[in-house]
């Protein structure tokens, strides 16, 4: 399938506009803290959420709002998570009402999200006072400001869009996301808001999203913490004019492929922007007996704090990788395992058939100092493969999280 990446982010698909402003939730006036994505018509909608038992109030409200598979807008604040508050659900519902009243739509058509400090009450006055400005500023170039408004400890905005064909019709998917810490998903430990002008039923949209999430966001880990507010929401306007997707046909597969491409872009950028991170680390496991084994092994390596620390130090300590494979719970023959490191600096094999082999430390260092490093693991037992995404573990990670509330 031919696919091209374009500008415009979450406002690139037909029917969508976006905006982001500073309303006053955050003390720093230079930081935007309120984002809005809006569609001119009713959308088919789907979402997946954190599996943390401590669940943010916005998720409770959003689940109810899109239980009919419909939505028209997404509103999100940063700075306060609205989690573990006695009046959290009431506040999230009121946030929907404030937004809906300003847009002239039903509050049940709002996806609401919050990100920030857990356990602190959210003051809705700044949101009330800023909503008119937020709505009046909605525009086709607003994805950038919306992406900035949902950031917390992120250092770069995360925004992508792509264009592809469905039944001869030009279709687009756009997305923004945030997340650099508390990323170890059982779904997608961050926020991602995705829009499309494809015509696809809510049922098929949810199916496609679940299919994509398991190979993208679920294979991402920055620090082993699963957050409380994580949401991936998708709105489909249907304005591109394709024949509505209601089954797993060729158009469904093409749409899912495009959605996967966008989500992979987001995941890699989130991994690279992990709190304090200096590099993206991708573990690709091949030669597994089945898909589950490949995923378990790749995720175990990426989640290892010792592997992360070795990547920070550009240390080719392959023993830590075998250790992570060994405790992963996967049924593998460690005596068959080969390990290589690869990057723009070159490629080097450091382990063969589960044992160390002579290698150049100088070349290994050259490979591992690059800002994108691949850990290549071959189990040599089958034909299945999987990739997991993460980053190195640095001094700055501790500093950022030690100072988070200040």
What spans do the regions from the language model cover?
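A structural signal for small-residue-enriched, beta-sheet-centric alpha/beta enzyme cores
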Residues: 1-90, 94, 100-406
């Amino acid at each position: 399938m031919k696919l091209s990446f374009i500008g415009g982010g979450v406002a690139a698909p037909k029917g969508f506009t976006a905006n982001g402003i500073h309303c006053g939730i955050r003390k720093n006036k230079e930081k935007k803290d309120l984002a809005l994505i809006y569609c001119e018509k009713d959308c088919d909608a789907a979402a997946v959420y954190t599996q943390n038992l401590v669940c943010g109030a916005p998720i409770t409200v959003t689940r109810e709002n899109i239980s009919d598979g419909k939505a028209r807008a997404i509103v999100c604040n940063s700075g306060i998570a609205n989690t573990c508050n006695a009046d959290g659900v009431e506040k999230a519902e009121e946030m929907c009402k404030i937004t809906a009243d300003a847009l002239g739509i039903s509050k049940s058509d709002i996806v609401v999200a919050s990100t920030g400090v857990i356990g602190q009450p959210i003051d809705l006055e700044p949101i009330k006072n800023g909503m008119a400005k937020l709505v009046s500023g909605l525009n086709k170039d607003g994805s950038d400001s919306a992406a900035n408004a949902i950031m917390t400890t992120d250092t770069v905005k995360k925004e992508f869009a792509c264009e592809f064909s469905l039944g001869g019709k030009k279709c687009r998917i756009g997305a923004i996301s945030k997340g650099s810490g508390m990323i170890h998903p059982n779904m997608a430990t961050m926020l991602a808001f995705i829009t499309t002008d494809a015509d696809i039923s809510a049922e098929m949209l949810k199916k496609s999203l679940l299919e994509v999430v398991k190979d993208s966001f679920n294979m991402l880990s920055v620090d082993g913490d699963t957050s409380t507010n994580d949401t991936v929401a998708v709105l489909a306007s249907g304005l591109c004019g394709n024949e509505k997707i209601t089954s797993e046909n060729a158009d469904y597969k093409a749409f899912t492929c495009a959605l996967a491409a966008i989500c992979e872009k987001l995941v890699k950028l989130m991994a690279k922007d992990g709190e304090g991170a200096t590099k993206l680390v991708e573990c690709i496991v091949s030669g597994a007996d089945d898909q589950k084994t490949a995923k378990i092994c790749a995720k175990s390596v990426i989640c290892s704090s010792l592997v992360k620390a070795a990547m920070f130090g550009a240390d080719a300590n392959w023993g830590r990788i075998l250790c992570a494979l060994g405790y992963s719970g996967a049924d593998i023959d460690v005596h068959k395992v080969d390990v290589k490191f690869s990057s723009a600096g070159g490629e080097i094999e450091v382990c063969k058939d589960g044992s160390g082999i002579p290698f150049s430390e100088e070349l290994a260092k050259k490979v591992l100092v690059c800002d994108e490093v691949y850990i290549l693991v071959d189990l040599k037992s089958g034909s299945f493969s999987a990739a997991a995404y993460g980053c190195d573990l640095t001094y700055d990670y501790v500093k950022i999280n030690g100072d988070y509330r200040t």
